[in-house]
Amino acid sequence: MKQPNFLFIITDQHRADHLGCYGNPIVRTPHIDAIAARGLRFNRFHVATPVCMPNRASIMTGRMPSVHRSRSNGIPLSLDATTFSQLLLEHGYDTALIGKCHLQNMEDRPPLVDPEDVGTLKPTPGYAEATHSDLEQAAYRQELRSTWTDPGHRLTLPYYGFSYVELCNHHGDETYGDWSRWAAAQMHDFEAHRGPGRGIPDARFSAPQARRTPLPEHLYSSAYIAERSVDYLRRHVASGSRRPFFLKCSFPDPHHPFTPPGKYWDMYSPDSVQAPETCAEPGPDAPAHVRWIHEERRQGKSLLTAQRMFAVSAAETREILALTYGMITMIDDAVGRILNALRESGLADNTVVVFTSDHGDYMGDHGLMLKGPIHYQGLVRIPFIWSDPAASQTGTSTESLGSSIDIARTVLARAGIAPVNGMQGRNLAPQPGVPAANEPDSILIEDDNQRAYLGFSEPVRARTLVTASHRLTLYLGADWGELYDLNADRLERHNLWEQEPVLRGALLERMVQKMMTLADRSPRPTRIA
């Protein structure tokens, strides 16, 4: 059987219901909707963790963060980890990544870690951790912004299994990598047209991190990824290569800051969008961590320009939604260009097209913005669309639970490649376009943070179990948790933790069973004893 090509499209911080094909009546995404119309849409697809770096590692390895060990932002994925792109490359695929990677650190700022013990002998770098690895060596500094100030810097290839990479890391109009060199070649002073402090004044918008960028549309990251992806497809055909390809198009948007360029800034008016029904001050029965975030904003202590979550008003939410929709429509236009090139190149009939994201965003749910260890559905539920030209059915959807760890095994199975020992996900589509019959009874979500906040005295650690009907979340060190009936209470307003002790106990037992199931099975024993 001929191996298919793969066009793998991933966005950043993009919740499932911010697409037309997932029921959003406002945002215009005709090209992504067309992928769904030709494919299989998963309506209950969830992250392994709602954080960029570790969930991207889970996607590439098919393993939970606690197992691949990139548990949070700031911990690079080990170069010893086996990614599904490495297996594709090993079995004859051309593997390419254009856009954001984030399997290694982007920021040069130091971590938020406990202070070192005073008065003790410190281990050498090679012995500072439980495993003999030095994550400060040059091989783990390849994606740092500071590293890319060297005009001669390039990623060492193959990079986590990608034999070709054009990097565009970070977010909004603050991206860098191969993109910034490409942009500088077209606009000599482009650095003066992007970033904080260089926005075009617009009195209509005052929401945190909303900035009208002077960067032209054709130099923005989404346009770059479209142009370079189209070029890759055309070069692949022109080369006469008989090798199948896996092309990962990784968009840094619609992650904040909210900087849609040109016409996309004005495409949606805040007056035309509605804040979520739950976008209000939390009542006394709201979970303690939600009340903490709102109190932080009332006291003027919120970090409104940083990466972590903050409380928002309904007016701020409408502004941010309008700009986010503009960023999403720009991505959709870019996707349209790539799909058109796929058809024009004669590749569409043997190319599986996949669309997903690394995690969602609160976007005003419960008066919250961005992301954090509060596992509302807007954050942990993401789009996943699998469009296979060999499918006998198209335009179908499934309510079967799915997880980011399922992606690796699903891609490998379609390519006819066996998974490695320790790969934890399942094949979502054993028959082209048909969801797997062995539906899981639950999925697990992990969340390990560097920060101690939300009222916790230690860095927040959470575990969530999602079943067909409920969501249960447990926090380390807390004598309370969260339990919601997702069928009767889809907005997650009524916490049943105290009212339903029998159900709570049953779900906690299922969570432990799930954690045991997801314990590492690698390496295999090499002898009986």
Name each model-derived stretch.
Residues M1-R471, Y475, G481, H494-E509:
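Formylglycine-dependent sulfatase
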Residues P208, E217, Q513-L518, A529:
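C-terminal extensions
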Residues M423-R426, A519-A529:
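Short, flexible loop/turn segments with low-complexity composition
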Residues D485:
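Catalytic Cys-His active-site segments of thiol-dependent hydrolases/isopeptidases
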Residues D489:
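Intrinsically disordered, low-complexity polar regions and short flexible loop motifs
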Residues L507-P525:
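Charge-dense polyanion-binding interfaces
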